[in-house]
Amino acid sequence: MGVPAGDVEKGKKIFVQRCAQCHTVEAGGKHKVGPNLHGLFGRKTGQAPGFAYTNANKAKGITWQDDTLFEYLENPKKYIPGTKMIFAGLKKPNERGDLIAYLKSATK
């Protein structure tokens, strides 16, 4: 299954409701409980400068792009066992597509 085309505005709402308590997206944004996500696409797991990642995140070694985020966001702890991300995931494919569309827009 490919990544469904997402709606940026719906994705922004999901980010605000489910992600913003732990993540920022703007350039130069601070790390919170989770890393700042600016420049996420094309970056390898565990590589945001200045954030203390688990060894599991550093060792995963994949590059964040639409398909890897789509799989990760469904069940983060299954995709990266040992991650400290406590988010249970987004089970609905369309919600993951919306969030990815927003992240692509907001983290450039």
UniProtKB/Swiss-Prot annotation:
A Pfam match: Cytochrom_C
Single GO MF descriptor: electron transfer activity
Modifications the protein undergoes after translation, according to the UniProt entry: Binds 1 heme c group covalently per subunit.
Binding site residues for heme c: 19, 22-23, 85
Keyword Heme appears in the UniProt entry: yes
GO CC annotations, alphabetized: mitochondrial intermembrane space
Record's subcellular location: Mitochondrion intermembrane space
Keywords assigned: Electron transport, Heme, Iron, Metal-binding, Mitochondrion, Respiratory chain, Transport
The family this protein is said to belong to: Belongs to the cytochrome c family.
Role played: Electron carrier protein. The oxidized form of the cytochrome c heme group can accept an electron from the heme group of the cytochrome c1 subunit of cytochrome reductase. Cytochrome c then transfers this electron to the cytochrome oxidase complex, the final protein carrier in the mitochondrial electron-transport chain.
Protein's name in the database: Cytochrome c
